[in-house]
From Swiss-Prot:
Pfam families: adh_short. NADP(+) binds at G74, A75, S76, E77, A78, I79, A80, K99, D125. Belongs to the short-chain dehydrogenases/reductases (SDR) family. 17-beta-HSD 3 subfamily. InterPro entries: 17-beta-HSD3-like, NAD(P)-bd_dom_sf, SDR_fam. Its main location: mitochondrion. This is Inactive hydroxysteroid dehydrogenase-like protein 1. It comes from Danio rerio (Zebrafish). Residues 2-82 are annotated as: Required for mitochondria translocation. GO terms for cellular component: mitochondrion. Keywords: Mitochondrion, NADP. It is found in: Mitochondrion.
Length: 319
């Protein structure tokens, strides 16, 4: 009995001496939970404000807000085509730039017939260097350019070790994903600055937040587009030019069956994605453009890099 009494007495003494520490830990835990709750509520508010509220209000007059013409660079890409159609739906005329006219001529004809706006095609292969800029400069000189949409070239997304890539593929990655965006932005931005209005939208990839093995050059080029957009925002955002970085995850495309995922809630069609993305223009400077993708991005940011690397290695090896 004495041993039991001694243990109980010892326990009470220890508990009494540690009570201050326990209260401190409880306070720290409460503060942590409160901060997480505030962050969660803020994220929910941002999600609703960005993706749901704009789709409930009436359509904006984009031509009056930004300008009458849009340049779509990389117009052969599925998202870029859909974005051009969405702009045309709002009465915006489009200039489709691609290295192969045959890949965008049908899109231009469809836009003109369905929406009654002008659609011009320009062939510009940036693998040829600065000479690719001349036809673009001539075409936009007399136009009220209000939008510039630069889309990354998805055909360069090759799953190979870096040293296995040919020089032509590497130059293509640099010229068509980096040089094209930089040079066309340089052509379009002065007119926007002069008018004090305009929008530059750079479409890259949500995968730019972490490195991707076997896609080193491609993933680095998407990170460039994101960083370039954010830098331009801080340089010219206070002068009437809205610069947005779009960071989508997987989007269904018109590629042959089996080479692209079918459209679903998590993998939207280009048309669904473009409709959601355009509604975020003028609201967010950096977004996935589609609310399920924003939820994906939240998970990606919380994921330790070693977990991401393990998953990306398995995925890229499978593709």
């Amino acid at each position: 009995m004495a041993a039991v009494d001694s243990f109980q007495l010892l326990y009470r003494e220890i508990a009494r001496s540690c009570s201050g520490y326990v209260e401190t830990l409880a306070l720290v835990g409460a503060c942590y939970m409160a901060s997480k709750t505030v962050i969660f509520m803020r994220d929910c508010y941002s999600l609703i404000r960005l993706y749901f509220v704009p789709r409930l209000v009436r359509h904006r007059d984009l031509s009056q807000q930004y300008g009458q013409w849009a340049i779509i660079c990389g117009a052969s890409e599925a998202i870029a085509k859909a974005y051009a159609e969405e702009l045309a739906r709002h009465g915006i005329c489009v200039i489709l730039i691609s290295k192969d006219l045959s890949s965008v001529s049908d899109t231009a004809r469809l836009i003109s017939n369905n929406y009654g706006v002008e659609a011009i095609c320009i062939e510009a292969d940036f693998n040829q260097g600065p000479s690719a800029c001349k036809p673009i400069k001539d075409a936009i000189s007399s136009k009220d350019i209000g939008f510039l949409v630069n889309s990354f070239d998805g055909t360069l997304e090759i799953s190979q070790n870096f040293l296995e890539l040919s020089e032509s593929v590497l130059w293509g990655t640099i010229n068509r994903n980096i040089a094209a965006t930089t040079l066309v932005t340089r052509l379009a931005l002065p007119a926007m600055m002069e008018k004090g209005r305009g929008a530059v939208v750079n479409i890259s990839s949500g995968h730019c937040f972490h490195p991707i093995p076997r896609k080193a050059a491609f993933s680095a080029s998407t990170a460039f587009l994101d960083n370039f957009s954010r830098s331009l925002h801080y340089e010219y955002g206070d002068q009437g030019v809205f610069v947005q970085s779009l960071l989508p995850f997987r989007v269904a495309s018109q590629r042959p069956e089996g080479s692209a995922p079918p459209a679903s809630w998590l993998v939207p069609s280009p048309q669904v994605y473009a409709s959601h993305a355009l509604s975020t223009l003028g609201i967010s400077h950096r977004t996935t453009g589609y609310w399920p993708h924003s939820m994906q991005l939240g998970l990606v940011k919380m994921m330790p890099e070693w977990v991401w690397m393990l998953g990306s290695r398995v995925f890229t090896m499978a593709t």
